[in-house]
UniProtKB/Swiss-Prot annotation:
One of its GO terms (biological process) is body morphogenesis. Residues 1-30 form the signal peptide. It comes from Caenorhabditis elegans. Belongs to the cuticular collagen family. This is Cuticle collagen lon-3.
Length: 324
């Protein structure tokens, strides 16, 4: 396997791994976004549902006198599945609606056959306002007239009200504060796969890549046709140019061979006498010199006469081999 093939394989594998990682990251992000959106929708729907239930509970008026009458009319808390008779609306001319348990009835002005109900404000109480300035003390009021003694109410069973139970909806109240987050809902079914996207616009041409490795040698081509003979014009010799500048000194070359011995030169003048040199070594013993003259007579010896012993001194020297 060549280096080029191994490099190409590694690059292709790295690119494929990068594309798969990007696709997986995009898929995970899309799923998380869809789940988050679904949870937000479920939470919003749950808030709306709880708000509706709370509004219905407020409209029912739990703990009020009318609720007690309705419970008693339908059999109380221990009622069975049977329904109480529907309330009967008054027919014909409008008159006072008697309230059970009271000997007198309220004065109701005449009108149409529609239900005469007062609109109750079921909105929650708003925040307390700022404390105002203290006002001046008022004048003492006039003593009231003593009232009449009340009449004892007979002990009668509560009767259902003859009026309508549902009143027209009032004006919407101010928006309440945001409630606590609800319980996380169940995960929904997996959505349908989306449509494939369209191809994007072609990108700008990239930069030129590095020079590739030289390719294999191609097959030798066929021999071409023989060309025409060329003409070689011979030009005239031009004028000699100016001498160029002297170049830099070259490196020192190797030592040359010894030259031939030249002829002896002219004898020079006699030089100045030099300094006296040191004593040389002793030379070899020279030849024996001639015999010396006879010495003087010694004091301890009587000299012979010249006539008697002329050769006595020479004989003595030969005997003792004295060397001078």
């Amino acid at each position: 396997m060549s280096v080029t093939t191994a490099t190409s394989g590694a690059l292709i594998f790295s690119g494929a791994s990068l594309l798969v990682s990007l696709f997986a990251a995009a898929s995970i992000y899309s799923q998380v976004s869809s789940i988050w959106t679904e949870l937000d929708n479920e939470i919003d729907s749950f808030k709306l549902l709880t708000n509706d239930i709370w509004g219905d509970m407020i409209n029912l008026g739990a703990g009020s006198a009318s609720n007690r009458i309705r419970r008693q009319a339908y059999g109380g808390y221990g009622a069975t599945g049977t329904n109480a008779p529907e309330p009967q609306f008054p027919q014909g001319d409008k008159g006072p609606l008697p309230v059970p348990g009271l000997p007198f009835g309220p004065n109701v002005s005449g009108g149409s056959d529609r239900c005469q109900c007062t609109v109750e404000n079921t909105c929650p109480t708003g925040p307390d306002g700022e404390e105002g300035e203290q006002g001046p003390d008022g004048q003492d009021g006039v003593d009231g007239v003593p009232g009449f003694d009340g009449q004892d109410c007979p002990d009668v069973e509560q009767q259902p009200s003859q009026g309508c139970f549902t009143c027209p909806q009032g004006l919407p109240g101010p928006q309440g504060s945001q409630g606590a987050p609800g319980i996380r809902g169940m995960r929904g079914a997996r959505g349908q796969p989306g449509y494939p996207g369209r191809d994007g616009q072609p990108g700008m041409p990239g930069e030129m890549g590095p020079t590739g490795a030289p390719g294999d040698d191609g097959a030798p081509g066929a021999s071409g046709m023989k060309g025409d003979d060329a003409e070689k014009p011979v030009g005239r010799q031009g004028q000699r140019g100016q001498p160029g500048e002297q170049g830099p000194d070259g490196e020192e070359g190797p030592a040359g061979k010894d030259a031939f011995e030249g002829p002896p030169g002219v004898e020079g003048e006699v030089g100045v006498p030099g300094y006296q040199g040191s004593a040389g070594p002793d030379g070899e013993e020279g030849p024996r010199g001639p015999s010396g003259l006879p010495g003087k007579d010694a004091e301890y010896c009587k000299c012979p006469t010249r006539d008697d012993g002329g050769n006595s001194h020479r004989a003595w020297r030969r005997k003792h081999k004295r060397v001078y």
